[in-house]
Amino acid sequence: MILKASQRGGGQDLAAHLMRMDDNEHLSVHELRGFASENLRDAFREVEAISQGTKCRQYLFSLSLSPPERARVPVADFEAAIERIEERLGLEGQPRAIVFHEKEGRRHAHCVWSRID
């Protein structure tokens, strides 16, 4: 699995990027955990609003998980990898969003956590 991660602000730009259908054949918001909102844009707005009361400017931790080119990875394997990564990074229980994209028949995942306690 190829992992790319970054701390970042700009939640609305990230939400727009993750919801782009012109770049992906299929898109699925798989999970929104710990948010009052029921959609990705509003969930990231929540985190941004909370961050305004702190000094934190990079209030999101974004991770993409891409399997090797020919691998067909089931959703459960992505979920297990995300759980292990979350534990290692100390992000257990933090609000998170998981989005799946499929591009040219290949599934990959994005997981975004709030860094604000």
What are these regions (language model features)?
Residues 1-117:
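N-terminal nicking endonuclease/strand-transfer module with a His-rich metal-binding environment
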